[in-house]
Amino acid sequence: MSGTSATAAVPFLAHSDAFRRRRFLNWFPLGVTYALLYMGRYNLTVAKNSLGELMTKEDFGIIFGAGTFVYAFAFLLNGPLVDRMGGRKGMLAGAAGSAVANLAMGAYLYHVVSSGEATSAPLRLVFSVLYALNMYFQSFGAVSIVKVNAHWFHVSERGGFSGIFGTMISSGIFLAFTVNELLLKAAQRVWPGAPGPSVAWVVFAIPAVMLALFFFVELSLLRDRPGQAGHADFDTGD
């Protein structure tokens, strides 16, 4: 009796192959985009190591602290906002906003270093504002993922899927630290003899380009519900 009840409590979901393919095209780019948000979040740490005295520990603490404060506060605003506008628009806003903020940080850094006036430039102030803006848009990521996937996965499917998706998201740490470090080394090979500060802009520009690329990927593929992608909506068991 108990076995029968347990079986009945978790219905078998006979998703078609077409549905599973379309669902993959929904969640996989979503996971990649979120990983790229990590790349455009912790790149500040990699840049700090390259900038040396242009970004002291005190500067970094203030800049990162401003971003962390905004990130925490933004959840209070963006959680209800994503509930209203949907996870698709939330993730698009996050990717676009973070791309613009990272591009601005990279462009500003390139400008002040190449001008030869980096030591007198208000780098701490400008980066505090731009990084806080970046972190505001970064806060759209997690809530948007939860909102979107809730409509595509039955509660009985989410356990196994969360492990796969969690691994994808963890790859963002690899992108943030390992790949950004490799980008710095590659830039120094492209411009031999260039000091670290003169190529640090790369770790902001490349994540910006990648986020912009995946903004358009998500614009094309990401949908809030199966019903918006040519498949029937279903009871997810929530």
Report each predicted region and the residues it spans.
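Extracytoplasmic
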Residues: L25-M55
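C-terminal ends and interior cores of transmembrane alpha-helices
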Residues: A96-S120
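Flexible cytoplasmic inter-helical loops of multi-pass small-molecule transporters
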Residues: L222-D238
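Central cavity-lining transmembrane alpha-helices of secondary-active solute carriers
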Residues: G65-P80
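Helix-loop-helix hairpin linking two adjacent transmembrane segments in secondary transporters
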Residues: F165-L222
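Cytoplasmic helix-loop-helix junction between adjacent transmembrane helices
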Residues: L130-T167
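Hydrophobic core of transmembrane alpha-helices in multi-pass small-molecule transporters
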Residues: A101, G116-F140
